[in-house]
Design a protein with these regions (language model features):
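Beta1/beta-strand and adjacent pyrophosphate-binding region of the FAD-binding site
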Residues: 1-9
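Redox-cofactor binding/interface segments in oxidoreductases and associated redox assembly factors
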Residues: 4, 143-144
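Core beta-strand elements of the Rossmann-like FAD/NAD(P) dinucleotide-binding domain
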Residues: 131-140
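Conserved N-terminal/central alpha/beta ligand/cofactor-binding core
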Residues: 15-119, 144-168, 172-174, 178-184
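Short, hydrophobic/aromatic-rich segments at coil-to-beta transitions
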Residues: 123-128
Length: 184
């Protein structure tokens, strides 16, 4: 399995697939840490807390990484009833990525490739992925491109293209979903 994108979703997918004994390659942009949090450095909260618990129950790693990289742990709505209370942790975003790198690199079945994906084409039986460095063939792809797919940054009244500040975008992938035929 090849996973395009090494953010939260990418490392979760890679970790779970490897637990099932599958060989996994994560292709992610160079210079960006695994599990990088692009915006808000919080994990949990009233809405996202449920998702984090579900990921944890399914064997995921977000909760483990958040516990290790946490700098503030808080129960929200603690003056209200249990139904609306939730745990939220503010994380050190750089430390979170460091721990994600350590955890993923320790898993034998996962290879991390730090290259920018330019194109993905469907070629039976599977796909050909062309990066800035070389081409790869794979039978299965999981796309977890996050904010990097046709990304646009708004700063005041100006707009620039990019995945987030100081990061490139994946312009070669923006037409991917309309070009690839999917089956339910």
């Amino acid at each position: 399995i090849t996973i395009v994108g090494g953010g939260h979703a990418g490392i979760e997918a890679a970790h779970i697939a490897a637990q099932f004994g599958l060989r996994v390659a994560i292709i992610t942009m160079p210079g960006i840490g695994l599990g990088s949090a692009p915006c808000n450095p919080s994990v949990g909260g009233v809405g996202k807390g449920q998702v984090v618990r579900e990921i944890d129950a399914l064997g995921g790693i977000m909760g483990v990484l958040a516990d290790k990289a946490g700098i503030q742990f808080r129960t929200l709505n603690d003056s209200k009833g249990f139904a609306v209370q939730s745990t939220r942790v503010q994380i050190d975003k750089e430390l979170y990525s460091v721990y994600a790198e350590e955890l993923i690199s320790a898993v034998e079945n996962i290879t991390v490739i730090r290259e920018k994906v330019n194109t993905i084409t469907q070629s039976e039986p599977g796909f050909e992925i062309t990066t800035t460095e070389r081409s790869y063939r794979t039978s299965k792809i999981i796309m977890t491109v996050g904010t990097f797919l046709n990304g646009k940054l708004h700063t005041g009244s100006s707009q620039t293209m990019g995945g987030r500040v100081d990061c490139d975008k994946s312009e070669g992938l923006q037409t991917l979903f309309s070009a690839i035929k999917t089956t339910p």
